[in-house]
């Protein structure tokens, strides 16, 4: 589960005992066989609340502020340059962003010693669950819930896009929720600035939410890729099942064209590659299905908004600002309460020559920025 703090699960009483280390400055916990070593200010109840390819997420309490937080441990974070860069990206981006609908980073736990710095612990604000869990649950969702979740997702995305950043991995498990129905976007490890749209490797983005231009290897993609993902997420929210659950690339494109219709030649202007155009033209042809017939539970305004999000040609897809101003969101939209980011985010640490050691140094500096005291002890 790829979340920075979704609640539930694990040792429910949080009664995990810690062992003091490094002269009592840190405490080590054993969580399902995972060693979790955090600064002593983070105290029980410690509960495992999520795990993924990167490691494990636990909730804890910051004894200095009384706030419950989510701590993500990324084990052996510097073994692989790509993953190390992803961690640095997430930290840098979340420190740059400040928005109600984007998860806040609270701390990078400073490693006790420089030479044994292998695991990164990122501390986030704690949320209760994520949209994936809610969609899969039996919890009833009203149209008002769905509308409010969509509004907050677009509101956060407006801020992200205004910072000249594409999220690139929007999916239900990356949208955190609390009991108030507040929604926060998380997991920025795959984000890119609009000027560095390198092609994404297969393992990267979840295929089901991937826009046609990415499925077709288009290298010059835009913020419209995130809008496509939002359309897929919104439909999944309303219908409680994925819209395009493709098993592979070929089936993914087929599911898309079966629903929204095969693209016409004028929809393919974004494709620079003749091979991609030829590939599209030789696929079986499908007529567009009327969404109101296929999804009779959806009202006309919701259908209209989704149809504008799920357009094959990214240039004809609705923008986030236009979506916020759509009649479907009229009761929530307030342009004066939809802030933008005033300084574009710069990935100025992206030199190809950066080694794992360079990245380790940069993450160390981030940890020191959060915890400036006693830096000399750590350096020695």
UniProtKB/Swiss-Prot annotation:
This protein is called Mitogen-activated protein kinase 4b
* UniProt xrefs under InterPro entries: Kinase-like_dom_sf (IPR011009), MAP_kinase (IPR050117), MAP_kinase_CS (IPR003527), Prot_kinase_dom (IPR000719), Protein_kinase_ATP_BS (IPR017441), Ser/Thr_kinase_AS (IPR008271)
- Reply yes or no: does the keyword Signal apply: no
Q: Residues in domain Protein kinase?
A: 43-329
- UniProt keyword list: ATP-binding, Immunity, Innate immunity, Kinase, Magnesium, Nucleotide-binding, Phosphoprotein, Plant defense, Serine/threonine-protein kinase, Transferase
What is one GO biological process annotated to this record?
innate immune response
**Positions carrying Phosphotyrosine:** 203
Task: Tell me what induces its expression.
Answer: Up-regulated only marginally in response to chitosan.
A molecular function annotated in GO for this UniProt entry is:
MAP kinase activity
Per the similarity annotation, which family is this? Belongs to the protein kinase superfamily. CMGC Ser/Thr protein kinase family. MAP kinase subfamily.
């Amino acid at each position: 589960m790829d979340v920075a703090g979704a609640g539930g699960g694990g040792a429910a009483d949080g009664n995990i005992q810690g062992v003091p280390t490094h002269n009592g400055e840190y405490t080590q916990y054993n969580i399902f066989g995972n060693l979790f070593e955090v600064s002593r200010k983070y105290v029980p109840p410690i509960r495992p609340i999520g795990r993924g390819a990167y490691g494990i997420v636990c909730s804890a309490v910051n004894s200095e502020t009384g706030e419950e937080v989510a701590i993500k441990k990324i084990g052996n974070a510097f073994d692989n340059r790509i993953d190390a860069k992803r961690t640095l990206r997430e930290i840098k981006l979340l420190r740059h962003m400040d928005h109600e609908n984007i998860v806040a980073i609270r701390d990078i736990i400073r490693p006790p010693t420089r030479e044994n710095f292998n695991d990164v612990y990122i501390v986030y604000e704690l949320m209760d669950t994520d949209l994936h869990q809610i969609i899969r649950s039996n919890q009833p969702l009203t149209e008002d819930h769905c509308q409010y979740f969509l509004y907050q997702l677009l509101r956060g995305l407006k801020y992200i896009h205004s910072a000249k950043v594409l999220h690139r991995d929007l999916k239900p498990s990356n949208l955190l929720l609390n009991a108030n129905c507040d929604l926060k976007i998380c997991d920025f490890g795959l984000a890119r600035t609009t000027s560095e749209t390198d092609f994404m490797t297969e393992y990267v983005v979840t295929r089901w939410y991937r826009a046609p231009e990415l499925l077709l290897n288009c290298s010059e993609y835009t913020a419209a890729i995130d809008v496509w993902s939002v359309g897929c997420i919104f439909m999944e929210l309303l219908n409680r099942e994925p819209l395009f659950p493709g098993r592979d690339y070929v089936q993914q494109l087929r599911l898309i064209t079966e629903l929204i219709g095969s693209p016409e030649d004028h929809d393919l202007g974004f494709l620079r590659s003749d091979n991609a155009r030829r590939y599209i033209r030789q696929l079986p042809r499908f007529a567009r299905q009327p969404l109101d017939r296929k999804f009779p539970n959806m009202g006309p305004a919701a259908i209209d908004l989704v149809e504008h999000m799920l357009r094959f040609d990214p240039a004809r897809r609705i923008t986030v600002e236009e979506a916020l101003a759509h009649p479907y969101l009229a009761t929530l939209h307030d342009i004066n309460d939809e802030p933008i980011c005033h300084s574009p985010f710069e990935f100025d640490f992206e030199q190809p020559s950066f080694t794992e050691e360079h990245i380790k140094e940069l993450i160390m500096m981030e940890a020191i920025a959060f915890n400036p005291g006693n830096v000399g002890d750590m350096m020695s």
